[in-house]
């Protein structure tokens, strides 16, 4: 199997899909990454855990429709070209 641009894009799509399907109450709260985490005081930078939670929330919010479109295109391409 050759390492091509298509396989790189497909791996990135799988990673974004993995982030998008993480459910907050079912999975993230069980490992201690729920929304009840406090964000430090005024002037303090948020920790890495809260930054990762913001990233996961942002990916789920912003990438919902584009992921549906890109996943559909990928499925059609795989069906057509194997």
Curated annotation (Swiss-Prot):
<dbReference type="GO" id="GO:0042593">
    <property type="term" value="P:glucose homeostasis"/>
</dbReference>
<dbReference type="GO" id="GO:0035265">
    <property type="term" value="P:organ growth"/>
</dbReference>
<dbReference type="GO" id="GO:0010467">
    <property type="term" value="P:gene expression"/>
</dbReference>
<dbReference type="InterPro" id="IPR013880">
    <property type="entry name" value="Yos1"/>
</dbReference>
<dbReference type="GO" id="GO:0005789">
    <property type="term" value="C:endoplasmic reticulum membrane"/>
</dbReference>
<dbReference type="GO" id="GO:0003309">
    <property type="term" value="P:type B pancreatic cell differentiation"/>
</dbReference>
<dbReference type="GO" id="GO:0008285">
    <property type="term" value="P:negative regulation of cell population proliferation"/>
</dbReference>
<keyword id="KW-0813">Transport</keyword>
<keyword id="KW-0812">Transmembrane</keyword>
<keyword id="KW-1133">Transmembrane helix</keyword>
<dbReference type="GO" id="GO:0003331">
    <property type="term" value="P:positive regulation of extracellular matrix constituent secretion"/>
</dbReference>
<dbReference type="GO" id="GO:0007029">
    <property type="term" value="P:endoplasmic reticulum organization"/>
</dbReference>
<dbReference type="GO" id="GO:2000269">
    <property type="term" value="P:regulation of fibroblast apoptotic process"/>
</dbReference>
<dbReference type="GO" id="GO:0005794">
    <property type="term" value="C:Golgi apparatus"/>
</dbReference>
<dbReference type="GO" id="GO:0050714">
    <property type="term" value="P:positive regulation of protein secretion"/>
</dbReference>
<comment type="function">
    <text>Regulator of endoplasmic reticulum secretion that acts as a key determinant of brain size. Required for secretion of extracellular matrix proteins. Required for correct brain development by depositing sufficient extracellular matrix proteins for tissue integrity and the proliferation of neural progenitors. Acts as a regulator of the unfolded protein response (UPR).</text>
</comment>
<keyword id="KW-0653">Protein transport</keyword>
<protein>
    <recommendedName>
        <fullName>Immediate early response 3-interacting protein 1</fullName>
    </recommendedName>
</protein>
<dbReference type="GO" id="GO:0007420">
    <property type="term" value="P:brain development"/>
</dbReference>
<feature type="transmembrane region" description="Helical">
    <location>
        <begin position="2"/>
        <end position="22"/>
    </location>
</feature>
<feature type="transmembrane region" description="Helical">
    <location>
        <begin position="62"/>
        <end position="82"/>
    </location>
</feature>
<dbReference type="GO" id="GO:0006325">
    <property type="term" value="P:chromatin organization"/>
</dbReference>
<keyword id="KW-0256">Endoplasmic reticulum</keyword>
<dbReference type="GO" id="GO:0043066">
    <property type="term" value="P:negative regulation of apoptotic process"/>
</dbReference>
<comment type="similarity">
    <text>Belongs to the YOS1 family.</text>
</comment>
<dbReference type="GO" id="GO:0015031">
    <property type="term" value="P:protein transport"/>
</dbReference>
<dbReference type="Pfam" id="PF08571">
    <property type="entry name" value="Yos1"/>
</dbReference>
<dbReference type="GO" id="GO:0048469">
    <property type="term" value="P:cell maturation"/>
</dbReference>
<dbReference type="GO" id="GO:1901142">
    <property type="term" value="P:insulin metabolic process"/>
</dbReference>
<keyword id="KW-0472">Membrane</keyword>
């Amino acid at each position: 199997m050759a390492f091509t641009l298509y396989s790189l894009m497909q791996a990135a799509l799988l990673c974004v899909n993995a982030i998008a399907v993480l459910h907050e109450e079912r999975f993230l709260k069980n490992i201690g990454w729920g929304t009840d985490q406090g964000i430090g005081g005024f002037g303090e930078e948020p920790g890495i855990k809260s930054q990762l939670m913001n990233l996961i929330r942002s990916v789920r919010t912003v990438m919902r429709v584009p992921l549906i479109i890109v996943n559909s295109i990928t499925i059609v391409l795989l069906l057509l070209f194997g």
